């Protein structure tokens, strides 16, 4: 069996053999892994695949294996969030997206590695050790959904689910040379996803091609009454896969090509824009003046929400519990021992931003900036159909290179976090290489206009071969 297959190819292979055999081959590949992409491999995957064979399931993903980020609840599998404090926590319920996947016949291979509580851009803060980039095992895969991107790039799953709070699907997609989509806020239910920053995050798919992104979105998107932010947009994603950008208007925000961008990244992205132009699209430069404040606004809002969300992890009801002479001592010791350095840093900064003397100065000001950033997107997208820019300003960096310098690491999100503030859809698609490392093109669209984003990405992909390249480290 080929190591890298599209969903259509996997389904064809299942017809030729069985879901059980295909799943077994993926599990064999996982067993030989060099990337540390999985925290947990499901012991029930083969049983689940065999059941699909016996029952003759005819769902859109019948027998197709998938990997799940370890902050998305799956009954019977640990949901650690990459943290010691939830190392042994097994949820008693499925996330909404998992229910949708199971109903479609998908086989869950396991739970993927991630930055602790999704706080990071490199998957180095995981309690279970860093994940390696399949293109260079000494480099990071990006984060926080680094495990999900790495296993797709390494051929250890045909596709995966991640979550994106400030770039956590798109960053690893760019670093690992795969496709990753952050849907419009509200398009995919967050029910059953352990919250980092509720107002920013969305569940999103990662795959080796744009078609499989659309296939997965048709399964997981839709209204969920258990999620108060859920919206039923009735979008049909696969119908957007039209190889035609004639008449498509592309906006190029100059602020996304700022100081510090790698020259090869800038060149590859411009080549991609000109390729779309050759195929019939037009482009114009647009300005988004408040983008320069987005990174600071994002981190204040995200850390503030995190400080509130993570207050629930105290060892009382579930997860790791340290011993203490009384309840207060137990909680203090549990949180001190259970959380990693980066998580504790963000809890402290978020608590500070929400404190009485600084709430107006920091948090409320960040919310005002968020509104201005959203207005920048609205204005720019009123003139064009999509925006195009680099996903990440630089290629993947070496493991350990930035982990001791949090400010430098935070700057990695400069091109991705504005999209989460605005709530618009954004996709990263491979568009080139520099020194053997992948480069991602970021395509952004109007709220719930994933079809325009997918159309642009699909057309670019069909007329280039970047998505067909495979990492030599794991070939």
Swiss-Prot record:
- Report what the protein is called: Glutamyl-tRNA(Gln) amidotransferase subunit A
Q: How does it assemble?
A: Heterotrimer of A, B and C subunits.
Q: Does the keyword Protein biosynthesis apply?
A: yes
A Gene Ontology biological process term: translation
Q: Which family does it belong to?
A: Belongs to the amidase family. GatA subfamily.
InterPro entries given in the database record: Amidase, Amidase_CS, Amidase_dom, AS_sf, GatA
Catalytic activity, as annotated: L-glutamyl-tRNA(Gln) + L-glutamine + ATP + H2O = L-glutaminyl-tRNA(Gln) + L-glutamate + ADP + phosphate + H(+)
Pfam families in the cross-refs: Amidase
EC number(s) for this protein?
Answer: 6.3.5.7
**Gene3D superfamilies reported in the protein's UniProt record:** Amidase signature (AS) domain
Extract the PROSITE patterns matched here: AMIDASES
Per its record, what are the GO molecular function terms? ATP binding; glutaminyl-tRNA synthase (glutamine-hydrolyzing) activity
Keywords, in A-Z order: ATP-binding, Ligase, Nucleotide-binding, Protein biosynthesis
Query: Which HAMAP family would you find in this protein's record?
Result: GatA (MF_00120)
Keyword Methyltransferase listed? The answer is no
Quote the catalytic residue positions.
69, 144, 168
Judging by the UniProt lineage, the source's domain of life is Archaea
Q: Which NCBIfam families match?
A: gatA
Q: What does this protein do?
A: Allows the formation of correctly charged Gln-tRNA(Gln) through the transamidation of misacylated Glu-tRNA(Gln) in organisms which lack glutaminyl-tRNA synthetase. The reaction takes place in the presence of glutamine and ATP through an activated gamma-phospho-Glu-tRNA(Gln).
GO CC entries = glutamyl-tRNA(Gln) amidotransferase complex
């Amino acid at each position: 069996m080929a190591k890298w297959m599209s969903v259509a190819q996997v389904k064809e292979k299942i017809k030729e053999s069985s879901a059980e055999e295909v799943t077994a081959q993926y599990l064999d590949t996982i067993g030989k892994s060099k990337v540390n992409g999985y925290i947990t491999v499901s012991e029930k995957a083969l049983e689940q695949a065999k059941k699909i064979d016996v029952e003759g399931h005819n769902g859109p993903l019948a027998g197709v294996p998938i990997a799940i980020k370890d902050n998305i609840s799956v009954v019977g599998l640990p949901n650690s969030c990459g943290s010691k404090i939830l190392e042994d926590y097994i949820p008693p319920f499925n996330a909404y997206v998992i229910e949708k996947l199971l109903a479609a016949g998908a086989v869950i291979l396991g739970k993927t590695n991630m930055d602790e509580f999704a706080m990071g851009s490199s998957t180095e803060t995981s309690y279970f050790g860093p994940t390696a980039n399949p293109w260079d095992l000494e480099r990071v895969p990006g984060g926080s959904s680094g495990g999900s991107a790495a296993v797709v790039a390494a051929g250890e799953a045909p596709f995966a689910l991640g979550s994106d709070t400030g770039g956590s699907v798109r960053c690893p997609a760019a670093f690992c040379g795969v496709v990753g989509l952050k849907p419009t806020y509200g398009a995919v239910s967050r029910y059953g996803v352990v919250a980092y920053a509720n107002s920013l995050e969305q569940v999103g798919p990662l795959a080796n091609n744009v078609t499989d992104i659309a296939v997965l979105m048709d399964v997981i998107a839709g209204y969920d009454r258990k999620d108060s932010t859920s919206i039923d947009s009735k979008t049909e994603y696969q119908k957007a896969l039209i190889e035609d950008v004639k008449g498509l208007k592309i906006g190029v925000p100059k602020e996304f090509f700022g100081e510090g961008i790698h020259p090869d990244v800038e060149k590859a992205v411009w080549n991609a824009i000109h390729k779309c132009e050759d195929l019939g699209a037009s482009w114009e430069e647009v300005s988004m003046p408040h983008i320069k404040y987005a990174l600071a606004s994002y981190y204040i809002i995200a850390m503030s929400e995190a400080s509130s969300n993570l207050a629930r992890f105290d060892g009382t009801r579930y997860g790791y519990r340290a011993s203490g002479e009384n309840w207060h001592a137990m909680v203090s010791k549990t949180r001190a021992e259970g959380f990693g350095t980066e998580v504790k840093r963000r809890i402290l900064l978020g608590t500070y931003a929400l404190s009485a003397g600084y709430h107006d100065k920091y948090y409320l000001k960040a919310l005002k900036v968020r509104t201005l950033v959203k207005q920048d997107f609205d204005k720019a997208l009123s003139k064009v159909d999509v925006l195009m820019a680099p996903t990440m300003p630089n290629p993947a960096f070496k493991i350990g290179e930035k982990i001791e310098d949090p400010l430098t690491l935070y700057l990695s999100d400069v091109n991705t976090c504005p999209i989460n503030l605005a709530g618009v859809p954004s996709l990263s698609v491979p568009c080139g290489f520099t020194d053997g490392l992948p480069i991602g093109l970021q395509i952004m669209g109007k709220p719930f206009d994933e079809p325009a984003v997918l159309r642009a990405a699909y057309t670019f992909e069909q007329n280039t071969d970047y998505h067909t390249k495979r990492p030599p480290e794991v070939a």
